[in-house]
Amino acid sequence: MSPYISLLKPRVIWLLILASVAGYIYGGGGVDSRLFSLLAVAFLSTGGSAAFNHYWERDIDALMTRTFKRPLPSGLITPNAALAYSLALSATGISLGFLLLGLLPGLFVLLGWLFYAVVYTIVLKRRTWLNIFGGGFAGNAVFLGGYALAKGTVDLPAVLISFAIYLWTPSHIWALAFKYRGDYKRAGVPMLPALIKEERAVAVISAINAAAAAYILWLYLQFGGGAGGAIVALGVAATIATSIYAAVKKTEEAMWKMYKASSPMLTLFLIALMIQRYRL
């Protein structure tokens, strides 16, 4: 993979892009020119913020076994080149958000970038274990941006649905951090699993993960319907099952299984919202 593609964190941003599309389709949008504009804007803005994260965290990435081979610590890209690249992508994405999508969707594009690149990456990540709760609003923003593009406004159902992404984020990130808690301790990054006893961390993360799954099921019962319910139930069941398994076993392997199940659950939920839009 090209180092410049790696800077975009494609394995991370694809789910955010899907969330923006789900918001648009659920809000009443269709397969049209606005959808393709949304895809371009979402790719540029989320990719730009991810690249900025690479630039800002290059020092701690060099200290962690999970990240030391990233383009900046490994010397494949210079810091100045990465910064210029990230800012160019970000500025283009945010500008096009306002120009192509409109004021309200563009505002959500800007807010999504600010919450991840500034609030999470610059301000909170190295200071407090609550960092993820500030950065998590970036997930709300991508869904709401797509929804606002379709509806022209934002309502309570959209806000509640956007919190599915917000509540999914802490347990997903912390389950990954649990596996690499030694890295975070070494780098001095205050992720929760690196700060508390392992058994306590497992209990907290698995409980939050199960709660997020239950919230997603409740959301779909309230605002969804149709054939999509089956796939939501499948994702929720797998997530709750792996959460219980992790809570009982209290092993790194069990936590990893829980981590691997959480992204498919959110993906299935977002797909189900789009299916529901067409009353399938």
Swiss-Prot record:
Predominant location category: membrane
GO molecular function ontology, one term from the record: protoheme IX farnesyltransferase activity
InterPro entries in the cross-refs: Protohaem_IX_farnesylTrfase, UbiA_prenyltransferase, UbiA_prenylTrfase_CS, UbiA_sf
Topology in membrane: Multi-pass membrane protein
EC assignment: 2.5.1.141
Pathway: Porphyrin-containing compound metabolism; heme O biosynthesis; heme O from protoheme: step 1/1
Swiss-Prot/TrEMBL catalytic activity: heme b + (2E,6E)-farnesyl diphosphate + H2O = Fe(II)-heme o + diphosphate
Pfam families for this protein: UbiA (PF01040)
Further remark: Carbon 2 of the heme B porphyrin ring is defined according to the Fischer nomenclature.
Reported function: Converts heme B (protoheme IX) to heme O by substitution of the vinyl group on carbon 2 of heme B porphyrin ring with a hydroxyethyl farnesyl side group.
Name assigned to this protein: Protoheme IX farnesyltransferase 2
Species the sequence originates in: Pyrobaculum aerophilum (strain ATCC 51768 / DSM 7523 / JCM 9630 / CIP 104966 / NBRC 100827 / IM2)
Gene that produces this protein: ctaB2
